[in-house]
């Protein structure tokens, strides 16, 4: 009797690498193709690790912002924030290196401002500043201070 071939189990960093690679290929075509890739990945990967979901939602936020879908962008930012703790625990060094280039804070602030949720935009400024992402977010916060 033949032995059953066990499915290969990828590591979380490998899964993240696959996500980024697929996104890079799709985004060359344009944001609509990137959105399609990300939505298909989200739908088909029911067991996607939460740490990778953080990055997926971040890419969704960027793509939806490029398409002017501010409500979708805001929802993606919420998803990224909900999975941020998992990314910190499972991909700590990768997240630390990637966070300055990620879109969730920048695009989240823009989305919430576009939707009139200035308090939410200020909260994102505070969280970005608390994570050490720099004076850029302090300046954004100062420019939104009138909303309080």
What residue spans do the PLM features occupy?
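Helix-turn-helix repeat elements of alpha-solenoid scaffolds
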Residues: 26-40, 70-88
């Amino acid at each position: 009797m033949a032995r059953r071939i066990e499915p290969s189990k990828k590591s979380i960093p490998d899964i993240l690498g696959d996500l980024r690679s697929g996104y890079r290929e799709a985004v060359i075509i344009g944001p609509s193709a990137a959105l399609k890739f990300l939505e298909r990945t989200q739908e088909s990967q029911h067991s996607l690790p939460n740490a990778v979901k953080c990055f997926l939602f971040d890419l969704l936020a960027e793509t939806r912002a490029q398409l002017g879908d501010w409500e979708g962008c805001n929802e993606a930012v919420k998803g990224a924030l909900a999975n941020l703790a998992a990314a910190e625990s499972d991909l700590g060094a990768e997240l630390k290196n990637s966070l300055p280039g990620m879109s969730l804070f920048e695009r989240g602030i823009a989305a919430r401002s576009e939707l009139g949720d200035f308090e939410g935009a200020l909260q994102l400024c505070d969280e970005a500043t608390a994570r050490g992402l720099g004076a850029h977010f302090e300046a954004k916060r100062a420019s939104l201070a009138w909303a309080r």
